[in-house]
């Protein structure tokens, strides 16, 4: 079973990916882990990636695609199957993944697409506030500070401000839509309502994956 999980920042993709991997005993392939492993093992692509990162440059697609190919070519992938998380990020990477899978004799069985209303994601992602004195982190909705606090006792990081969050989501939506469309044409996208409780979302995902088998 080879799967890809997609969803906007804050949609709970990381939480659900961990549950999928544990339940179905798949290999979790996340972009960050792949890069770290390739650089630590000094693979051909890992050395190349490090040369860009050390200079503060963006790693070009061909290097990212190469790192993915190196990982998918390892023996444990055919034995256990995988869950791809954080790749592909662009339609060009999606086409490269198609070619990689074909070259390695692998297929993508399903794309789990966690859908959450962007407006509620802005609330989720822009709710983080930090106490100016203690540095403690709270969330306006999920973990509000208890006690005699005033609004001016807290600050928000630039990254957490609603307008910054909205810009980030807009970029993710623009990049993600062509990828979803690409996989819809292949008939392998399964949409999941991510507005529900974590356990309910996973129950829906579990049903979908079991029906893919």
From Swiss-Prot:
GO terms assigned for molecular function: adenylate kinase activity; ATP binding
Any one Gene Ontology BP term: AMP salvage
Residue span of region LID: 127-160
Pathway of action: Purine metabolism; AMP biosynthesis via salvage pathway; AMP from ADP: step 1/1
Subcellular location: Cytoplasm
Enzyme Commission number, as recorded: 2.7.4.3
Reaction(s) catalysed (UniProt annotation): AMP + ATP = 2 ADP
Key word Nucleotide-binding present: yes
Keyword flag Coiled coil: no
Family statement drawn from the similarity comment of this UniProt entry: Belongs to the adenylate kinase family.
Entry protein name: Adenylate kinase
Species per Swiss-Prot/TrEMBL record: Streptococcus equi subsp. zooepidemicus (strain H70)
Higher taxonomy: Bacteria, Bacillati, Bacillota, Bacilli, Lactobacillales
Gene this protein is translated from: adk
């Amino acid at each position: 079973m080879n799967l890809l999980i997609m969803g906007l920042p804050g949609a709970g993709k990381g939480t659900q990916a961990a549950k999928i991997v544990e339940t179905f005993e798949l290999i979790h392939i996340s972009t960050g882990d792949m890069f770290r492993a390739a650089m630590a093992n000094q693979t051909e692509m890992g050395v190349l990636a490090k040369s860009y990162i050390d200079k503060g440059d963006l790693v070009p697609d061909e290097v990212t695609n190469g790192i993915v190919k190196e990982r998918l070519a390892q023996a444990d992938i055919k034995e256990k199957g995988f869950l791809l998380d954080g790749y592909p990020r662009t339609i060009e990477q999606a086409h490269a993944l198609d070619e990689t899978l074909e070259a390695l004799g692998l297929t993508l069985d399903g794309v789990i697409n966690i859908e959450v209303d962007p407006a509620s994601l802005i609330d989720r992602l822009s709710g983080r506030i930090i106490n100016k004195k203690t540095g403690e982190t709270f969330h306006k909705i999920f973990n509000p500070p208890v006690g005699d606090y005033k609004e001016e006792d807290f600050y928000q990081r630039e990254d957490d401000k609603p307008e910054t969050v909205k810009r980030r989501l807009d970029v993710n939506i623009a990049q993600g839509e062509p990828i979803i469309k690409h996989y819809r044409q292949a008939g392998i996208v399964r949409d999941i309502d991510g507005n529900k409780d974590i356990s309910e979302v996973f129950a829906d995902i579990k049903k979908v994956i079991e029906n893919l088998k």
